[in-house]
Amino acid sequence: MTMKLQFDHSKKFQLDAIESTVKLFEGQQKFDASFVDFVDGVVPNKLTINENEIFENLKDIQKQNKIPISESFEGMNFSIEMETGTGKTYVYLRTIYELNKKYGFKKFIIVVPSVAIREGTKKNFEITKDDFQILYNKIPIQSTEYSSKNISYIRQFSNSNKIEVMIITRDSFNKDVNIMNTPQDKFYGK
């Protein structure tokens, strides 16, 4: 007999964090899942709003959450900060489903600081997957750990019409960034 964890879907502080992230893209058109960039067969996350609109959304979210308002836009780098043990991993995994539901986003890269955190993230993904499948009507989702030894996975990641989540450590990203941008025979020269 296997033990199944029960998740509380109604913790206000978690829902507030998820909603804040989703609101960053307020005004974004929902991406049509049938659209594919036929030149390369890529299924992208295509933004229909610009950085100025995202910056205005950011300031609204900061005001709503009573945190200091940014004076300038410093790029598309956002963080949700929560205390240890409050469900950060649950929040960002559920945020993936919400961003897909509201905007049709399908490509996500989770960059973690260490191998231990990567392994914990993979385990959390497995533990929560069945629960999220019930909550989000069995939306197809695939999670894979990035490995420079399996560079062809990046092509699969970009071509898939499912929600794709790539989990990578910060060190792998920094070390392998040149590999990602270098033509590879295994990667069909792209």
Protein language model regions, located:
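RecA-like P-loop NTPase motor core of helicase/translocase proteins
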Residues: 1-190
